[in-house]
Amino acid sequence: MTETSLGTSNELLVELTAEIVAAYVSNHVVPVAELPTLIADVHSALNNTTAPAPVVVPVEKPKPAVSVRKSVQDDQITCLECGGTFKSLKRHLMTHHNLSPEEYRDKWDLPADYPMVAPAYAEARSRLAKEMGLGQRRKRRGK
């Protein structure tokens, strides 16, 4: 800014301060000792409003590394953040992207039932657990 515009700006602030204080004093009882403080406060408030308003930049939605449809395949699941393929995404998301599965789903607008494990891998794990007898009640001993 040039000195001329600074002077004009400062003069405008003084005029506005005078008008506001005059209007306030005409409708309110203000002790004479508090007038300098009132004038300084109004001038300071007006001076702080001369700063330009911050420009709000719209946040662009991130582009996934692959399409959501192609990210889930039978034998692998692809990370939308980096494009890597995995059998299980949960650990990768936490260690490389610092995201929980819920945060990942929210970030990419995925449904709550979006898998974090490749379907074939989940099926193999399920089959193995059933063969081992996990999830079944144990027989009671000696009664």
Curated annotation (Swiss-Prot):
A zinc finger (C2H3-type) spans 79-97. Changing E103D: In strain: EFB1. GO terms for biological process: regulation of DNA-templated transcription. The keyword Electron transport does not apply. Keywords: Activator, DNA-binding, Metal-binding, Repressor, Transcription, Transcription regulation, Zinc, Zinc-finger. InterPro entries: ROS/MUCR_sf, ROS_MUCR. GO terms for molecular function: DNA binding; zinc ion binding. The keyword Metal-binding applies. Regulator of exopolysaccharide synthesis. Represses the activation of EPS II (exp) genes for galactoglucan and activates the EPS I (exo) genes for succinoglycan. Also negatively regulates its own transcription. Belongs to the ros/MucR family. This is Transcriptional regulatory protein MucR.
